[in-house]
Amino acid sequence: ERWDRCVAATAHPQPYGFSWYLNWVAPTWDALVYGDYEVVFPLFPREKNGISFTTRPYGTQAVGPYSTIPLSAQWVEALMEEAMKHFAYGEFFLSPSVALPSHWTSEKYSNFILSTKASYEELAAGYSAQTKRNLKKAQKSSLESAQWATAHDVVRLWKQNTQDKTAITAENIDSLAKVLEFCLYQKRGVLLAVYDEGNTLVAGQIWVQFHGRSTLLLNASSSYGKECGAPTLLIDQMIQLHAGSDHILDFEGSSIPGLARFYSGFGAHDEPFYFHVENNLPWYLRWRKPKTTRS
């Protein structure tokens, strides 16, 4: 409870740092804890060929550090130094609100979010011309809500249409599927999906909903679903569900230009997070991995 209170201290926190989420995606996770859980920093110890390292587990994006007190850049640097006492190599994906030391050269990654405080009419008016066209096309396509679709159905749709275009392994996606099923079972998630006229699932999305934030963890669509604008229709439904409330829709990315255009087409803006590397490997191994991102 103390851990989760610290993670929840940020308004509309991302789900990745909560203990129940970490327990699913990284059962052997560890952490740095300061004081009475005033600052917490999840770590993910791994070992390969006798070399200890840490990197984020699949199913997470930015993972801390989290705090209930102001966290300066000096604090963040001290946490990093403490963490690296345990690893020869570290990849850290730092949360959007984290202050970075000025001499760090951490890489910026995109993450698109949308506040739904405004009315639906105001939010829809902010859609791009392309998004409005896609939505109109979907509304004319005789798509039907797939009320009985399951997480398994949406994962299968993703595997059939997207997996071979990515570097994501079957083990990765099966692990994520367990997290999604848990979230839906615990009422911490929502599944939206549509069938075509032939009762075939053509698009599905699973969002994790927790502490005033809905995060799109899986977005699956067939080629026909994309062609008729089904993903746009589902996101529009999600916006309608939360319009007029103090809520954040988190699209999770992306740095891929096409996806960035798609999500920003709903009026979403970029809330970047940061990739920081600490490379203390022996000299004969150091060149194989990214350099330390600080000058």
Set out the residue ranges of the language-model regions.
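Non-catalytic accessory segments adjacent to catalytic cores
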Residues: 72-111
